[in-house]
């Protein structure tokens, strides 16, 4: 019984995460590869409107040998699979900074995506979170 419960919980978390990611993607770009746009003084690119420092923090997924970080960032941001991996990596890197806040995984993911490594602690990310929450019903 314990194993069945654990499997169910794992599947439920995966779906919640997928719903959360989809809503962030929809909020940022309509979930389309929209290229780069100026946002708060720097470029944000692709499906999740990822900035260069965010790409660096997420571990630079799919960066090729000899490729500049800027070229890899723009390419990754406009590839849904790579960009999603980047958002997941960023969440996993910084979620511990939100421990003890009582926030669910989607809230931490959304608010940190919007406000940086400690976005979960900034009131300025609440409006963004409320939009994501109304999309997915996540917590």
Swiss-Prot record:
Active site, renumbered: 28 (proton donor), 39 (nucleophile)
One MF term in the entry's GO annotations: lysozyme activity
GO BP field: antibacterial innate immune response; defense response to Gram-positive bacterium; digestion; killing of cells of another organism
Compartments where located: Late endosome lumen; Recycling endosome lumen; Lysosome lumen; Secreted
Enzyme Commission code(s) on record: 3.2.1.17
Binding site for substrate: 51-57, 90, 113-115
Sorted UniProt keywords: Antibiotic, Antimicrobial, Bacteriolytic enzyme, Digestion, Disulfide bond, Endosome, Glycosidase, Hydrolase, Lysosome, Secreted, Signal
Induction text: Induced in the intestine by Gram-positive bacteria M.nematophilum CBX102 and UV336 and M.luteus DMS20030 infection but not by Gram-negative bacterium P.aeruginosa PAO1 infection. Induced in the intestine, pharynx and vulva by Gram-positive bacterium S.aureus infection. Induced by Gram-positive bacterium B.subtilis. Induced by starvation.
Signal peptide: 1-18
Coiled coil: none
Effect of pH on activity: Optimum pH is 4.5-5.
Any GO CC annotation of this UniProt entry: lysosomal lumen
Tissue: Expressed in pharynx grinder muscle pm7, isthmus marginal cell mc2 and pharyngeal muscle cell pm5, intestinal cells and at lower levels in coelomocytes and epidermis. Expressed at low levels in intestine.
Domain I-type lysozyme: 19-138
The keyword Disulfide bond belongs to this UniProt entry's keyword annotation: yes
Family of the protein in this entry: Belongs to the glycosyl hydrolase 22 family. Type-I lysozyme subfamily.
Name listed for the protein in its UniProt record: Invertebrate-type lysozyme 3
Source organism phylogeny: Eukaryota, Metazoa, Ecdysozoa, Nematoda, Chromadorea
Designated gene of the protein: ilys-3
């Amino acid at each position: 019984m314990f194993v069945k419960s654990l499997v169910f919980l794992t599947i439920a978390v995966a779906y919640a995460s997928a719903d959360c990611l989809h809503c962030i993607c929809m909020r940022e770009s309509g979930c389309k590869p929209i290229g780069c746009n100026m946002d708060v003084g720097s470029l944000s690119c692709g499906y999740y409107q990822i900035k260069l420092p965010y790409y660096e923090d997420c571990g630079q997924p799919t960066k090729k040998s000899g490729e500049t970080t800027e070229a890899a960032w723009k390419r990754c941001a406009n590839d849904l699979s790579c960009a999603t991996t980047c958002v997941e990596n960023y969440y996993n890197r910084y979620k511990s900074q939100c421990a003890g806040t009582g926030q669910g995984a989607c809230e931490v993911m959304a608010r940190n995506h919007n406000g940086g490594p400690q976005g979960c602690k900034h009131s300025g990310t609440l409006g963004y979170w409320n939009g994501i929450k109304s999309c997915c019903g996540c917590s």
